[in-house]
């Protein structure tokens, strides 16, 4: 796709940006498998006990949970880690002395679902909170 988008095969034993991939196996399994199951359980409990979510918020929560479950299934099914395969070129981002980024870290559809739905949920909560207080939040 002209170098902007590449399909690659990367096994990621960590989480976003491969954070934690150098941790011991038992610690990784707890942090990246057991803990997410607990968090998903809590999200489900809140989701089904709360009747104040808008339809958009409910869809966003489903997208987050679906992405999380997709990554968990991949993590349990593959000892070598979650498969990431979408590699996107971005304009060079650099903060002198801190970091530079020439390509976005490789990700998968579940990651995209989680990130996009989290953004939708945050904006939706901000709009809902602004509407309840009688004003719109700045910039929205």
Model-based region annotation:
Residues 1-140:
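Alpha-helical transmembrane bundles and membrane-interface segments of multipass inner-membrane proteins
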